[in-house]
Amino acid sequence: MSDTPAERALIIDDGSPCALVATLLEQAPEGITLWSMGAGDARASASRRRVALLGLAGVERIDAAMGLDDERTAGVESARLLLAAGAAAIRLGAARLVWPVALGDDLRAMGAAADRVRAVERLLDLETDPDTKPLRFDLPLLDLTLEQVADLAIDLDAPAEGAWWCEHEGAGPCGACPSCESWQRALQQARFGVAGTRAKAGA
């Protein structure tokens, strides 16, 4: 076993299946901290469960409101999110910042996300100590669709209790909000049940 410390990384975490899959793709979970931006206790609880299930370094909860649902300002708010997460990653001594967005069905959005990351990287580089090692940005799911992310969840035996895809609070996902509808469709196509198990053959 190597004595080399695990590389530290910060994952922007909204509690979604995308964040869960991105976490599972990491090779050294003990070096991973979740930057929990999930609004509501259900998403935050999913993040805490993931820390316990996967042996992660910890979770940081942020309270800053982000207007990501408003199309008029979503791009600006995404940039603000990345800048705040980048500052947090540098403060924690992380080498990488992981942004688990899946935009594979929207080429324009993919390009905008990549441009946004480059702009934030440049700004962080300009505004941090010159002796600080540049922060690396990682978008491991960028060119995937939600259905492909769901397929990955199956391949990785993802524990569904480590994610929360509903826009509302409750004992379980409501099944009716836009987020639930999108993820239910993707998960059903991938045969990934809400309990986190594969559907039986022929079911």
Ranges and model annotations:
Residues 111, 175-176, 199-202:
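Charge-rich, low-complexity amphipathic helices
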Residues 26-28, 154, 183, 191, ...:
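General N-terminal targeting signals
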Residues 162-185:
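Local cysteine-cluster metal-coordination motifs and their immediate loop/turn environment
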Residues 169-170, 191-203:
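Short cysteine/histidine-rich metal-coordination sites, predominantly Zn2+-binding motifs
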